Structures are given as C-alpha cells and as structure tokens.
Amino acid sequence: MGKASRNKNKPDAVKVTKVANPDQGRSWFLPVMVAVTLIGAGAVGLLAVNRDSNSGERPLTSDHWHAAYGINVCGEWQDPILDTADPEGIHTHSDGVIHIHPFRTTAAGQNATVDAFFRATGSVLNDFGYQPGPNIPAADVLAADGCGGEPAVWQIAYWDNAIIAEGGAEPDQIITENLADFRFEGDIAAITFALLPVGEDVPPPPTIPQLSQLTDI
C-alpha cells in the first residue's frame, strides 16, 4: 500500500481577513485635499500676479515710472487731484505726478491706461468729458460745453520726455479719440488732459519740476 499523507486528516487553515476601519483612511484624506487645494490656488494667484512679467508688456509689476500731468480746461489749469487712493498701483500723491508702479495685472502692460489712473479715484475721463471722483472738489466738464461758446474736445497731449517738453517741444502725440484707453508708455513723461478747441496748442503740464522732487523712486 502506498504511504498515506500525514496531512490528509489535518483541517484546512482558516484564512483571516482584517476588515479596515473605513474612518481610518478618511482621517488624513480631507487635510491632504485641503492642503493641495490651497497650494494650487496660491500657485494660480502667483501666476496671475506675475503674468505681465512673462508677457514682456511694460510697465511690469517691477517697474516704477512717473509722468507729470495737468488738467487744462479752456486754458485754465485745474488743481492737482488730491485723492491718493491706490487700488492697483497707478495713482498720485497729490503732487501733480502720476505714479505708475502697478502691483496688479489689471494696471500693468496693456492695462496701464489713463482709465486705470482716473478710476483709482472714482473719476472718469473719456471723449465726452471729465467726471471727478467723490473726493475731488471739482465739477463735471463735458466736451459739449465747449470753450467760451466755441466747440472744443477733450484731448491728450503726450511727451515721451518731460524735460524736453518743459523746453517747449511739441507733443509726441495728440490723442482726440478713445482717451480712456491711452496707455502710459515710459518713465519721466509728461501728459496734459485738456478741453480745448481743435487745433489749439496744448501746453505741457506745469508740474514737470515735481519730477525732480520725487522721493519714492
């Protein structure tokens, strides 16, 4: 007879399966997901802030430009804007100078516009008129009002170099349409916002000397 196996009558081993507590996995899952979400949101925000640096459109958030400005209504210079609100980085210090150092992409690159400057104080300047913000003690001035009974238009005179402008140079640009969209193009510039008859010479702003008095550059 053949030799019987020793294990023939040995009972099969019982396989024990450990049932995991469903709450154990969840204890770390939620914090990890929250952390991942926060990190992702931070990265997206950082990319948004620095997007203009990658595009190369100036001014960048690292730029710090200045432009002397003045508002001329029918030959009369208006007081400099005193409201120093600065929600996006294009503002004034009540000194007759536009400080252009955007810290948001909404005011950098192609967005560094005349509209960005005026909206910082709740003001509006466009082809139809100038509406000062609530903290500026001045009245609205519409193009339709004209100058002394003569038709007039709101316009922008822009000098690339304020020093040359002060010496009597002609403006590099005269803009009579889409004023709000005009973009600041460089440092130490001069810009006059004027309501004057078409063809009348637009003078440079009287605040150009302030550019040599700046302390925040």
For the regions a language model picked out, list residue spans one by one.
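Ubiquitin-like/PB1-type beta-grasp interaction modules and other compact soluble beta-rich domains
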Residues: 2-217
